[in-house]
Regions:
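Conserved active-site-proximal phosphate/metal-binding subdomains
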Residues: 58-100, 106-234
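Active-site entrance/lid segments in N-terminal catalytic domains of soluble metabolic enzymes
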Residues: 1-93
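Charged, low-complexity surface patches
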Residues: 5, 103-104
């Protein structure tokens, strides 16, 4: 199965012709769900095998404006609207298209709420980071445990989208206008001028993976502050 985010994968069905690989686009709005499903239907005579709805409480890059993220928008209606869009294509293609809700799923009540809205599954990331089973660096896990609600902020990314991350020493400097010009451009983004960006996102995510948390971009979900110790998935 290919889960595709950071934009709408308009030509994905073309690449998968003749294969049994399943397609699961990530959407954040009724509009984006309508666009990708309509495009696939008309251009490729195909539809999704699963839809993942990533809401405004998710970590990392987000498909919302900064204003939307700061307004605490009520997202339930959007989820139900996307589910209604999916039902049209379930009927047309005579197949089940499970809808999975992601973003802010931090406890059983959030899971139940997602199912009550009509979802068939949930996607959880942040809650599993501070666990023994997670293979993230221990320093990275500790940042989640130390984080308070006010430490979790919306940040500007070189990718051009807002994101949610922990405000550490590095991010405080970025917020205050300091720039970190990369020593070497890796060419990971098509539209990126190393002289203009506040920092190299690849470089800072590598620091996170290596546990250099004072220098890293520490993406997290909105509820990261709710965990105060390393637990186990079991």
């Amino acid at each position: 199965i290919i889960v595709s985010g950071a934009g709408l994968p308009t030509e994905l069905p073309e690449y998968l012709k003749g294969f049994k690989t399943k397609m699961a686009p990530i959407v954040s709005s009724v509009k984006s769900a309508k666009v990708i499903l309509k495009y696939w239907d008309r251009r490729h005579n195909a539809t999704a095998d699963m839809i993942i709805i990533e809401g405004p409480k998710a970590g990392g890059h987000l498909g919302f404006s900064v204003e939307e993220l700061e307004s605490e928008l009520d997202y339930d209606n959007e989820i139900q609207g996307i589910i209604d869009v999916v039902k049209e294509y379930e009927k047309k293609y005579n197949k089940d298209i499970p809808v999975v809700v992601a973003g802010g799923i931090s406890d059983k009540n959030k899971v139940k709420h997602a199912f009550d809205l009509g979802a068939q599954g949930v996607q959880v990331a942040t809650r599993f980071v501070p666990t023994k089973e997670c293979d993230a660096d221990e320093n990275y896990k500790k940042e989640y445990i130390k984080a308070k609600k006010e430490d979790i902020v919306i940040v500007k990314s070189p990718v051009g989208m807002p994101g949610r991350a922990i405000k550490n020493k590095f991010m405080e400097k970025v917020i205050n206008g300091e720039k970190f010009t990369p020593k070497k451009c890796l060419g990971c983004l098509a539209r990126c001028n190393p002289k203009e960006i506040p920092y190299c996102i690849t470089e800072r995510l590598i620091y996170a993976a290596k546990g250099k948390t004072d220098e890293a971009l520490l993406f997290c979900g909105a509820d990261a502050y709710k965990v105060n110790k390393i637990t186990t998935v079991k």
